[in-house]
Amino acid sequence: MSGVRGLSRLLSARRLALAKAWPTVLQTGARGFHFTVDGNKRASAKVSDSISAQYPVVDHEFDAVVVGAGGAGLRAAFGLSEAGFNTACVTKLFPTRSHTVAAQGGINAALGNMEEDNWRWHFYDTVKGSDWLGDQDAIHYMTEQAPAAVVELENYGMPFSRTEDGKIYQRAFGGQSLKFGKGGQAHRCCCVADRTGHSLLHTLYGRSLRYDTSYFVEYFALDLLMENGECRGVIALCIEDGSIHRIRAKNTVVATGGYGRTYFSCTSAHTSTGDGTAMITRAGLPCQDLEFVQFHPTGIYGAGCLITEGCRGEGGILINSQGERFMERYAPVAKDLASRDVVSRSMTLEIREGRGCGPEKDHVYLQLHHLPPEQLATRLPGISETAMIFAGVDVTKEPIPVLPTVHYNMGGIPTNYKGQVLRHVNGQDQIVPGLYACGEAACASVHGANRLGANSLLDLVVFGRACALSIEESCRPGDKVPPIKPNAGEESVMNLDKLRFADGSIRTSELRLSMQKSMQNHAAVFRVGSVLQEGCGKISKLYGDLKHLKTFDRGMVWNTDLVETLELQNLMLCALQTIYGAEARKESRGAHAREDYKVRIDEYDYSKPIQGQQKKPFEEHWRKHTLSYVDVSTGKVTLEYRPVIDKTLNEADCATVPPAIRSY
């Protein structure tokens, strides 16, 4: 770490001069601005003023660049470095501050440590959980790879909770079954107490230090560098010293996480601002299925902090003001461990019908105090602490007040199961050369219309690794990096300059709050056409208000006002596509529940035998992916659709799961 400390001293010594005469600081020739976490090397970099004399740009060249250093980004980055690729990792946060750290419940894999299990049963549950909007080839790949992925993490040193005989402990989780839904509740969720994400992220970070990856830490990625339909790297802002960097690479992996902060109440970190999703949009590429936003059933009432599904997996129950275990009415078999969309809607209905708890009757209770205190202390130690801090509740004596809270984005950047980003042209999927995506930023689509709990950490490691393997298959370390135009990234720098000196009438924080409240009010657990239409108008107006922003910090050193404004631009693009996609989808499927279109509209009516039915044309049913585009200059949203992939990778080994009516 001596290299990190040395660079910190260097930057601190120059900070005052940089603030006073920033444009001249970079004009002294070649120098390295970034660092490797282990301090072993500096990549060569050259300064040029080809874009602007006011904003000189530092140019770098790598075999591959990964944007984001959460679970997916780290796994992709060190997978590439391990294969010999000269790899950069650009992240606006230090890696262990990424939002992966907040995941609590666990990671699904059919290890069979608690009872007989099979990855094909996991495959079935995931397809069913997706409400048949998931692509079955990608789900096949993820669930088959899951056991090996968990064993790999164990070999990296991840300290999984253990059974008495030393095996990885696996808890029950929502939507998980045995024998294709006919064998009862599965115990498939591998965990580290209730801090699995924290453990996973630190394990991957520790592993990454073995490899010679160049980390650009606290660098904000502004845009992709696109040339002739190919991705050739990214342009980024160094938050610490205000320098601009073009990182040219033959392969670019986007792993920037979700965009939960489009909503007022969410479990996401304040840094979950959809940066990669917005970069894809500005590049003229589509995003997929952004209308599918998961509400986690158990966010702490009034605070929004996550209470893991593992609480219910360990035996916790949801109760209403009458003391009823109400999930028995809505999901007679799975009860409190039905899929998240089912539980969130059931809770909302209980509150609507007057059975909510508290003085306002606007939440329900999660009861844990019937469980043995030693079980709570061993399996749910973090939850006990969180409940006391944010709700003032001793979980051994009283229930936790909870309410559905925005938690996860099923949609994102469309990819295939290899992590390659797709565009849809003339009815056919086409790969975008040089561009990959993984993690919550991507939409493979393994989650479809609703993600099963504990499939997200699995998604990170499986598809982060898949991106590295795909690049290894198609490229060699040291391959020539395609050139970029001398002024590549010029628009990004112009936008940054415009925001830096924005002198309108609306603060960034005010506009962000208006957007978040509009999304919360108009695109929540239950949706209706008239409210969605009103929401579309409001978000479009707010998008137009971006040109009236006012920023206050004109400097370039740690200008968080500027960074938050750049993040707001990204959030707005995500919000537009989310609410317009939701308004257009005239059905209820998974997390998208329309009160004016209460049924799922498939190519057949699967509540009846399909023999004798005429298949609906593609234009008349909704079992299809939404592709959304935004004209960045006007905010106009354009929607297209692409078919769901029903075929698995090997039908003889893993049969397709045909659509059916979903019940738990």
Curated annotation (Swiss-Prot):
**Originating species:** Pongo abelii
The gene behind this protein is SDHA
Q: Which GO terms describe its molecular function?
A: electron transfer activity; flavin adenine dinucleotide binding; succinate dehydrogenase (quinone) activity
Q: Which compartments is it annotated to reside in?
A: Mitochondrion inner membrane
Residues bearing Tele-8alpha-FAD histidine?
A: 99
Provide this UniProt record's keywords sorted from A to Z: Acetylation, Electron transport, FAD, Flavoprotein, Membrane, Mitochondrion, Mitochondrion inner membrane, Oxidoreductase, Phosphoprotein, Transit peptide, Transport, Tricarboxylic acid cycle, Tumor suppressor
UniProt lineage? Eukaryota, Metazoa, Chordata, Craniata, Vertebrata
**Protein name stated in the entry:** Succinate dehydrogenase [ubiquinone] flavoprotein subunit, mitochondrial
> Chief location of this protein?
mitochondrion
Give me the residues that bind FAD, please: 69, 72, 91-92, 98, 100, 105, 221, 275, 440, 456-457
